[in-house]
């Protein structure tokens, strides 16, 4: 009897430890079209990307950042401008498509070139579907540009970050 109670107690403790001490998975969302830097890494198109190849959806950090890696050291390669990031040739209007692996209530989506916000789309505090697309007007820009796309979550202090390399105007060599 005592052995049965001991085994039951151990099982309850093991279950409670697993349930209450589990670290949340950092799997959420990224821009997959045009291919973001993390999408290119996951597809094997850029060498030496590190752990991002396994979790392109995990670039999450505090709101307000303006870098490609959300200040996560193991994803610092995403902000390395010396890497051969392929650029997608586009016209002056570009449709960005986000893919979500965990959907969160959304404050908004922001798109930046340099320090200039070129577009913002309201999320109305709603949970998005599995994919969301936004068409952004890049008139006034030409040549190689890096777009920082940000998915701001409405009920946390965090956001998800994706950088997309583009050749705006569709002419010239899209490679760095």
How would you describe each model-predicted region?
Residues 5-6, 10-13, 116-119, 126, ...:
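Membrane-topology and secretion signals of cell-surface/extracellular proteins
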Residues 117-139:
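Extracellular carbohydrate recognition and processing domains
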Residues 131-171:
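Extracellular/periplasmic metallocenter environments
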């Amino acid at each position: 009897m005592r052995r049965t109670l001991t085994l039951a107690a151990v099982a309850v403790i093991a279950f409670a430890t697993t349930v209450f001490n589990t670290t949340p998975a950092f799997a959420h969302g990224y821009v997959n079209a045009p291919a973001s830097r993390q999408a290119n890494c996951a597809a094997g198109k850029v060498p030496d990307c590190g752990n991002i190849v396994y979790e392109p959806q995990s670039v999450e950090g505090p709101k307000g950042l303006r870098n490609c890696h959300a200040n996560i050291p193991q994803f610092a390669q995403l902000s390395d401008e010396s890497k051969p990031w392929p650029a997608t040739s586009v016209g002056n209007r570009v449709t960005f498509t986000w893919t979500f692996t965990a959907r969160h209530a959304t404050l908004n989506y922001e798109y930046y070139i340099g320090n200039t916000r070129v577009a913002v789309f309201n999320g109305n505090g709603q949970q998005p579907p599995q994919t969301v697309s936004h068409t952004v007007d890049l008139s006034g820009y030409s040549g190689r540009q890096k777009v920082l796309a940000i998915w701001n979550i409405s009920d946390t202090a965090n956001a998800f970050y994706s950088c997309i390399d583009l050749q705006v105007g569709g002419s010239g060599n899209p490679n760095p």
